[in-house]
């Protein structure tokens, strides 16, 4: 679906907003305190390895109303790389995370790992504005039960899972004002289920395609219109014979964006989506939106926003579809000679049941809200070491099912060694 696809591509840019401020030159002496990495091919290829060590206190490790607490020690090695050409750039990351639970190591997951790649290419002529832009991205992650909405692609659901995202955008700029792009995406989500311990969760595979056209009336105003189609294939389960495992979503949206500004970028689309769930046509329809924005107010201070709404099959029940609405706001500030970065973000996610089979969805027919707030700081001691700390508050509430409500507090301190 176009809304979700656009949000995922925009997220790759917005998530790194604080990192952009940290990694750029900010005056005399700042370069000496930043990781330089290993450089090859006349500095076109840069590889930056790192190892993070941290301690976390978690007040609710399994995100339930019962609220069982534990302490967690984490070791996370990884590496980031960037390879630049004259008109292209290839960037990627590889990471591993080991969680050692003090009291519940026999039941809680320990290993998470993943990788990501992004390729950008352009031949747009600066004078005429004509040419092509290409963006390709992929990522894989195996994430253990330690789940947070504000970090590591968290979904607010406690369960081991694997996720694959592959996406691409090809844009044609006809002039410095007129442009059009086609988009494609594949997603795969799979949960590890042990029905002897807990109720199953259901993943899917998804194919999506979209088309967007725009006219840049000015650098502040890019008029946009977009349409998209998405097909979900949900994992089957017992009692699912009355439904096809395929669901379809159509989306039409229009809105505004920016074209060539440096300090302020935004993209806001709104429109309508239609859901056909499990072979049942016209299961639901409604308005949807997509939002991404970044405002670099000063060299040190930045604000960002990211949000979207979309339809999808439910993850907690068969015979059920939901509409997800989400919004995240973030801020980042550099101080102490650019050695310290202060950051804060707030994320909200609402899941509304829009289709429910009374038999298959029994006990799961409730809307759910998840709110997460995080504040943190990191301080670069030198080019080899950074210390960091953050606190994370998460609250979940479910309409008419108060036994599923929970809140969660996490506090983390750690050190990151880098080169």
Predicted features and spans:
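Cleavable N-terminal export/targeting peptides
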Residues: 1-31
């Amino acid at each position: 679906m176009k809304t979700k696809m656009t949000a995922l591509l925009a997220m790759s840019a917005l998530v790194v907003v604080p990192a952009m401020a940290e990694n750029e030159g900010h005056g005399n002496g700042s370069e000496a305190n930043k990781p330089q990495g290993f450089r090859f091919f006349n500095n076109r290829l840069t590889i930056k390895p790192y190892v993070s060590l941290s301690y976390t206190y978690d007040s609710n490790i399994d995100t339930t109303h019962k609220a069982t607490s534990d302490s967690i020690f984490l070791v996370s090695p990884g590496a980031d790389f960037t390879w630049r050409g004259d008109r292209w750039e290839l960037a990627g990351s590889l990471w591993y995370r080991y969680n050692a639970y003090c009291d519940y190591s026999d039941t809680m997951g320990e290993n998470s790992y993943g990788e990501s790649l992004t390729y950008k290419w352009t031949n747009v002529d600066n004078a005429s504005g004509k040419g092509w832009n290409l963006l390709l991205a992929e990522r894989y992650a195996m994430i253990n039960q330690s789940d947070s909405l504000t970090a590591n692609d968290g979904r607010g659901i406690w369960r081991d899972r694997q996720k694959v995202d592959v996406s691409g955008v090809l844009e044609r700029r006809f002039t410095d004002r007129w442009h059009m792009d086609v988009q494609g995406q594949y997603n795969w989500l799979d949960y590890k289920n042990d029905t002897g311990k807990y109720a199953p969760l259901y993943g899917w595979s998804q194919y999506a395609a979209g088309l967007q056209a725009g006219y840049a009336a000015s650098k502040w105003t890019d008029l946009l219109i977009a349409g998209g189609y998405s097909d979900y294939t949900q994992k089957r389960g017992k009692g699912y014979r009355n439904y096809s495992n395929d669901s379809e979503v159509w989306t039409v949206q229009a809105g505004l964006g920016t074209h060539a500004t440096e300090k302020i970028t935004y993209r806001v689309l709104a429109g309508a989506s239609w859901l056909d769930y499990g072979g049942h046509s016209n299961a639901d329809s409604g308005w949807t939106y997509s939002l991404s924005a970044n405002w670099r107010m000063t060299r040190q201070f930045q604000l960002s926003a990211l949000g979207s709404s979309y339809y999808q099959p439910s993850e907690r029940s068969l015979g059920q579809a939901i509409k997800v609405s989400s919004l995240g706001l973030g801020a980042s500030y550099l101080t102490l000679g650019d050695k310290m970065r202060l950051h804060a973000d707030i994320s909200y996610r609402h899941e509304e049941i829009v289709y429910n089979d009374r038999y298959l969805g029994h006990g799961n027919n409730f809307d759910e809200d998840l709110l997460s707030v995080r504040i943190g700081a990191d301080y670069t001691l030198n080019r080899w070491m950074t210390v960091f700390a953050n606190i994370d508050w998460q609250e979940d509430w479910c309409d008419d099912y108060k036994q599923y409500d929970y809140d969660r507090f996490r506090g983390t301190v750690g050190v990151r060694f880098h080169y």
